[in-house]
Amino acid sequence: MPDTPTLTLAKDLLSRQSVTPEDAGCQELMIKRLKALGFTIEIMVFEDTTNFWARRGTEAPLFTFAGHTDVVPTGSLTQWNTDPFEPTIIDGMLYARGAADMKGSLACMIVAVERFISEHPEHKGSLSFLITSDEEGPFINGTTRVVDTLKERNEIIDMCIVGEPSSTQYVGDVVKNGRRGSLTGNLTVKGIQGHVAYPHIARNPIHQSMAALLELTMTEWDLGNAYFPPTSFQIPNMNSGTGASNVIPGTAEIMFNFRFSTESTVEGLQQRVIELLDKHNLEYDLDWIINGLPFLTDTGDLLTAVVDAVATVNQQKPELLTTGGTSDGRFIAQMGSQVIELGPVNATIHKVNECVKVDDLEKLTDMYQEVLNNLLA
């Protein structure tokens, strides 16, 4: 049995070693298909990152498929059962780096749009693609830069599906209609270095910071809401000391991270942290990194269209969740866009032997096409 159009394109994309921020010709392959459909292509290169914006139509609403062609490194090749860049089907599963995250989705998007335009050449509104090779990297020169460019010329995305692997057990069982925000703090508590035998003429920043850190970990930041769990505070990194057993360190460095709901704000969290540190009379420096703001699409045409499309294909409505890490959807949501994530099962993403069910790719293609039918036919 010959490969389907979706599987053929997926294999072609997966055979290209596009480890972030490399694209390895994936975007060129997609652009060729989109040009044939009448899309206008705008390639946007920012430093080491290749992006493209493709649009068909000039009317509202503007619907966008967003995704990335880059993949994470393979890890140890000896741990893979197959070559990660030679897509291989075993027992109905397609194995390759990027199969689930997210070249499989890209193939589904392209084929769904080809089918939709074939059936509805004079469709309503506008179709577009926002594709980057920087999602798995530092996310500095990718989607966020394209969004800035679009905003500068007032080209605003109304609705967007991000092809991130949202599903858990089977394709479409979960769609993400929002994501938590991420805020990182880099705290340096200052002490006075000295000999451990003379603590009275030194000041131990580890000891000084312990009460404040404990209080930070015990604080209830908010209660969450119907869509988000309560905001969480975690300390992923701590560093202090010289390595010697007889030296009180001069500084203690603590990195902490909030994953926060729409019930909290960056400014509110920052203010509460500063007040707590000051209450404990710490001498410190504190730098902040806003990794992303929370977003939520709890109503609107896109949510309805996606839920109905999944129900049509699966005979069951999806669960709406906001769990997991951040995605490029956070940048697009800043435009005021409705944003939904719908993609393959995420059980093997970033792991060795990453894979996706071949049948799931066909179902996902049908879901994407049905969304377009619901919105723009």
UniProtKB/Swiss-Prot annotation:
Sites where the protein binds Zn(2+) 1: 68, 101, 164
Subunit (UniProt): Homodimer.
Keyword Transport annotated: no
Organism lineage string: Bacteria, Pseudomonadati, Pseudomonadota, Gammaproteobacteria, Vibrionales
Matches recorded under Gene3D superfamilies: Zn peptidases
Native organism: Aliivibrio salmonicida (strain LFI1238) (Vibrio salmonicida (strain LFI1238))
UniProt-listed Enzyme Commission number(s): 3.5.1.18
Keyword match Metal-binding: yes
InterPro entries to which the protein is assigned, alphabetical: ArgE/DapE_CS, Bact_exopeptidase_dim_dom, DapE_proteobac, Peptidase_M20, Peptidase_M20_dimer, Peptidase_M20A
Protein name stated in the entry: Succinyl-diaminopimelate desuccinylase
Top EC category: hydrolase
Family from the record: Belongs to the peptidase M20A family. DapE subfamily.
Pfam families named in the record: M20_dimer (PF07687), Peptidase_M20 (PF01546)
CDD domains: M20_DapE_proteobac
Gene Ontology terms: biological process: diaminopimelate biosynthetic process; L-arginine biosynthetic process; lysine biosynthetic process via diaminopimelate
